[in-house]
């Protein structure tokens, strides 16, 4: 049996577990329960009505958070020749070709987002064991495999708060919305952007109820159940 600490026990007293909160109310409760000494991350967890094993029900996409993630984002670009110069001009923090691939392979991971030109992917693909498990592998579906002329836009989006979402093996999407120190309205607008992107990315093979449950939680806090109708109404025009 897991024993929770005093701060967790005090925090959960603020939560009515019999309720499904409206998104704005859930954010307010989650912020009040964030009692750690550090600025806790706010995450949303959506149980989807999708089968992770069904090829027609895969969910993956990108959302741009209007209020960012509350941290400095370091961007790495795999490119060579003129494209490498373009990466530098576009403001990439780290950029390069074969030597950079060797550096990453050796353990260099001081970056938050990795971008690649299409022609580099045959080499970058060999970094799957290093980048894949950390969610850093460039991927065309997430808009991180792009030609050099798109570097500036993609890098700017990454710095503003470009987040990827993907259905995990349990049929759940986990996504960061920001920090507990954010204003409630900022977190709500970030959430709206994420839900809208997820609804617009609905797989063609999806059947029945698309979002089955929605919870909000800070790093050290308990989950706050959200009203499904209210969450679903946040996105998808």
UniProtKB/Swiss-Prot annotation:
Pfam families: Ribosomal_L1. GO terms for molecular function: rRNA binding; structural constituent of ribosome; tRNA binding. PROSITE patterns: RIBOSOMAL_L1. CDD domains: Ribosomal_L1. Keywords: Repressor, Ribonucleoprotein, Ribosomal protein, RNA-binding, rRNA-binding, Translation regulation, tRNA-binding. GO terms for biological process: regulation of translation; translation. The keyword Acetylation does not apply. GO terms for cellular component: large ribosomal subunit. The keyword Cytoplasm does not apply. It comes from the Bacteria. Signal peptide: none annotated. Binds directly to 23S rRNA. The L1 stalk is quite mobile in the ribosome, and is involved in E site tRNA release. Protein L1 is also a translational repressor protein, it controls the translation of the L11 operon by binding to its mRNA. Belongs to the universal ribosomal protein uL1 family. Part of the 50S ribosomal subunit. This is Large ribosomal subunit protein uL1. It comes from Dehalococcoides mccartyi (strain ATCC BAA-2266 / KCTC 15142 / 195).
């Amino acid at each position: 049996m897991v024993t929770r600490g005093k701060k967790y026990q005090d925090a959960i007293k603020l939560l009515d577990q019999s309720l499904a909160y409206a998104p704005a109310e859930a954010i307010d409760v989650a912020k009040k329960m964030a009692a750690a000494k550090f600025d806790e991350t706010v995450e949303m967890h959506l149980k989807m009505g999708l089968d992770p094993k069904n090829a027609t029900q895969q969910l993956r996409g990108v959302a741009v958070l209007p209020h960012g993630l509350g941290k400095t984002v370091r961007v790495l670009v795999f490119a060579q020749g003129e494209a490498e110069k373009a990466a530098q001009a576009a403001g990439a923090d780290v950029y390069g070709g074969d030597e950079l691939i060797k550096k990453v392979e050796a353990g260099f991971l001081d970056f938050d987002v990795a971008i690649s030109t299409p022609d580099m992917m045959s080499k970058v693909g060999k970094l799957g064991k290093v980048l894949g498990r950390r969610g850093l592998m460039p991927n065309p579906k997430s808009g991180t495999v792009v030609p050099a002329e798109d570097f500036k836009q993609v890098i700017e989006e990454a710095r503003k708060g470009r987040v990827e979402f993907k259905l995990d093996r349990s049929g759940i999407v986990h996504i960061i919305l920001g920090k507990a120190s954010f204003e409630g309205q900022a977190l709500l607008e970030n959430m709206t952007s994420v839900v809208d992107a997820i609804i617009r990315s609905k797989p063609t093979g999806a059947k029945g109820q698309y979002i089955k449950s929605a919870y909000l939680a800070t790093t050290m806090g308990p989950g706050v159940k959200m009203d499904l109708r209210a969450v679903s109404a946040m996105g998808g025009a």
